[in-house]
Swiss-Prot record:
Its cofactor is heme. It comes from the Eukaryota. GO terms for molecular function: heme binding; iron ion binding; monooxygenase activity; oxidoreductase activity, acting on paired donors, with incorporation or reduction of molecular oxygen. Heme binds at residues 267, 409. Keywords: Endoplasmic reticulum, Heme, Iron, Membrane, Metal-binding, Microsome, Monooxygenase, Oxidoreductase. It holds the Pfam family p450. It is a peripheral membrane protein. PANTHER family: CYTOCHROME P450 4AE1-RELATED (PTHR24291:SF187), CYTOCHROME P450 FAMILY 4 (PTHR24291). It is found in: Endoplasmic reticulum membrane; Microsome membrane. Its EC number is 1.14.-.-. This is Cytochrome P450 4d8. Belongs to the cytochrome P450 family.
Length: 463
């Protein structure tokens, strides 16, 4: 209980490190009648995350239930299996190739908007990146522009931002995670949360209905004509895949589709924003890494800003891959993942021997801590992209920024391509300067920084 009283978003990392030094990478904690296992142990993590049996997420995620319903993040059992199977083809190379066009266009807008900030003064880069990530995920998930980067941000984009912040705050408080206690102690915030969720869900449903109608019109036109413009020129979106899918012989309902689209909107903007903001901050503090990265960008993409960047171009940015890997190692966007055991978990261990963790137990895997273990990563608190060069492979389950196993992040390829595009465009255009305060990590649903993501930017002389 003492541990839980000491834990909050700001102290989580510090207290976690103290406990690891004192008790090792495996700890058992009782909170009243709840058994919690805190694991930074690669052997145990591998067995749990690889398991096809222990797939139920930790109950803390239920905070997101009112918004995301039974979407891929929160569902389990048959529903999760069916939805995962439907959504996996969305990340096939040919569809990702189309998504890269969106990354290209929206990152150009981001670069243009950053020009106002690139005056050598300190600013927090988070909002600019967040707006771009929202525009990207809306256009790729829903096939709809929401103009989050435009001056007049849409009510939908604002609702996503405000609701994410509110849910993140609730996530780190044991009593606020209980919907009834939250409602009783903060009725005004419960009302606000409901309003925000209604705004988002009404918008999503409207888009789904419009897209469903367009798809039906398109199919009837295709039967009458072989007009090229009807089909092949239209970019696929996740929504199209969902609209054309069936479960047990029936199409998905609007509500089922909405749950998946909302899940992608939440997971696809917040995590990427965190990853990119931390990466830009580290680049601003490491001019030698930035210079090496710029050299590669110019070599692969050239200096013609009007030339579209393709998925193949992004594949050639090998040093940038090392930079992204190192940033994800130090700052995994999802710093902790958890499971609630529905059945006994039998494990084997080279040090602790074989054993059983009983059904009903909760297991928390601290990805942030796993990535900072000096026995795997010497000088773990230093930003050294070169440690990932020359195909040097880290043992599986010792580097898991996208989690691992059957419930790993389905959009990891998407996220990496988006990060590459944004970083390439920003670093080619602007020098990142080491200004303002350093980041101070806060552990939440998504990793954040207490001090924001402060840096300076200066337009490069055209190279």
């Amino acid at each position: 209980m003492q541990l839980m009283l000491r834990l909050n978003p700001k102290t989580f990392i510090k207290v976690g490190r103290e406990y690891v030094l004192k008790f090792g990478h495996l700890q058992r904690v009782w909170i009243f009648n709840r058994l919690l296992i805190m694991s930074g142990d690669a052997e145990l993590n591998e067995q749990l995350l690889s398991s096809q049996e222990h797939l139920v997420k930790h109950p803390v995620y239920k905070v997101l239930g009112q918004w995301l319903g039974n979407g891929l993040l929160l569902s389990d059992g048959k529903v999760w299996h069916q939805r995962r199977k439907i959504i996996t083809p969305t990340f096939h190379f040919s569809i990702l190739e189309q998504f890269v066009e969106v990354f290209d266009q929206q990152s150009n807008i981001c670069v243009q908007r950053l020009a106002q900030k690139a005056n050598g003064n300190t600013f927090d880069v988070y909002r600019s990146i967040c707006a771009a990530a929202l525009d990207i995920i809306a256009e790729t998930a829903m096939g709809t522009k929401i103009y989050a980067q435009a001056n007049e941000s849409t009510p939908y984009a604002e609702a996503v931002n405000e609701c994410t912040a509110l849910l993140s705050w609730r996530f780190m408080s044991v009593y606020l995670q209980v919907e009834l206690l939250f409602t009783l102690t903060h009725p005004h915030l419960k009302w606000r949360q409901t309003q925000l969720i209604r705004t988002m869900q009404e918008f999503t449903i409207k888009v789904i209905e419009k897209r469903r109608q367009a798809l039906e019109d398109q199919q009837s036109k295709l039967m009458d004509t072989a007009d090229e413009d009807v089909g092949s020129k239209r970019r696929m979106a996740l929504l199209d895949v969902l609209l054309m899918s069936t479960v047990d012989g029936r199409p998905l309902t609007n509500d089922e589709i909405r749950e998946e689209v909302d899940t992608f909107m939440f997971e696809g903007h917040d995590t990427t924003t965190s990853a990119l903001s931390f990466c830009l901050h580290e680049l601003s503090r490491h001019p030698e890494v930035q210079a090496k990265m710029l050299e590669e960008i110019v070599q692969v993409l050239g200096t013609d800003r009007s030339r579209p960047v393709s998925i193949r171009d992004l594949g050639e940015l090998k040093y940038m891959e090392c930079v992204i890997k190192e940033s994800l190692r130090m700052y995994p966007p999802v710093p902790i993942v958890g499971r609630k055991l529905q059945t006994d978990f039998k494990y084997t261990h080279s040090v602790h021997g074989d054993g059983v963790i009983p059904a009903g137990s909760e297991i928390i895997i601290g990805i942030f801590g796993v990535h900072r273990q000096p026995e795997t990563f010497p000088n773990p608190d230093e930003f050294i992209p070169e440690r990932h060069e020359n195909g040097s492979r880290v043992a599986p389950f010792k580097m898991i920024p996208f989690s691992a196993g059957p419930r790993n992040c389905i959009g990891q390829k998407f996220a990496q391509l988006e990060m590459k595009m944004m970083l390439a465009k920003i670093v080619r255009e602007y020098e990142l300067l080491p200004m303002g305060q350093r980041v101070e990590c806060i552990v939440n649903i998504v990793l954040r920084s207490e001090t924001g993501f402060q840096l300076g930017m200066r337009k490069r002389k055209h190279n």
